[in-house]
């Protein structure tokens, strides 16, 4: 295992821009508190999309709604994308698994990146209470039977084996340090897919899901939302053109990082 860097992000701050790290759940809480509750409909199961004079959405409860525009930000397994592109809208397994957990009282208050053979992990602060996020990406091939077993990723023995795989090549005893550990298989997009129906916009992971080795997920979602806002405000049609160009750049860097981070040095 090799520690590659400490990043003090405060050095990039100025009077108008400040960089920070935070827990994803806290960001979601912030948004939910600031969006009127009557504008959010939970447990809406989309089953069909039709484009007539307006875009018509049909839901599992047999209700339907019409819209001028649809912005789909429903994640890696986007239901919108699967309706539009059928099986071609499904992502593929990246032969990697992510571990996410929490560490208390870590000795370094900066962002720390550690590289090892076939894995890497990042530790970064999420608040002023000496709590840190731990995120690791581990190369792991799975057979079809394992992929279809959703209980596998909640199995304590499976998760402990992954932690031991890292700990055995690290100076950290991660078993004792990492709390609230969770495990996720990583899926990425197969290719770019642009809806033929007018005024339907895919954004975030619903548009394209990257290998998670460039810390780009949230930043690209925010950037894409800004691009789309400007596109609609100016009545232009450059959104997908700009997104594909930028996404190709980010995807190539992320794929290269994933390869470089997991190199074995003998």
Regions from the PLM with identified roles:
Residues 1-85, 89-102, 143-145, 155-156:
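Conserved N-terminal helical subregion
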Residues 77-78, 98-100, 119-122, 207-208:
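Histidine-centered metal-chelating micro-motifs
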Residues 184-211:
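FAD-binding beta-loop-beta segment adjacent to the flavin cofactor pocket
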Residues 6, 13-19, 23-24, 28, ...:
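Conserved FAD/dinucleotide-binding core of flavoprotein oxidoreductases
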